[in-house]
Amino acid sequence: MKNIGRISQIGAALWILNVWFNRFDKDTGYRGGDATNMKEEFQEYGFSENAMYAVGATKVGLAIALLVGLFVPKIVRPAAIGLAAFMVGALGMHAKVGDPLVRSAPALSVLSLSTLAAVFAGGRS
């Protein structure tokens, strides 16, 4: 079970890092509303550019914490719970703008991975 947690925390972390560093300016097909990049997506949700960067910095920080958690297990659970909370928010934003369910697939996937990481990793021996 511990391996499920570790694989999940790595998967969630790499997914978030990929979105914020490799796909930031790309139209992925999963963007909210009619957005074609991250800035437009946050505008669709009614958030400012500053809010976008704050959310991004927090998500990236949580993703890094999940990776560091491979060596410092006690930080995994709080980081995973924090990331899961952001994914619940992302699901809410997709619903707010009336997106089809498929656009929520990445957020639902990271929510699932974060939940598994919180349950099966973080301080367990």
Residue ranges and their predicted role:
Residues 1-125:
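Short amphipathic, positively biased membrane-proximal segments
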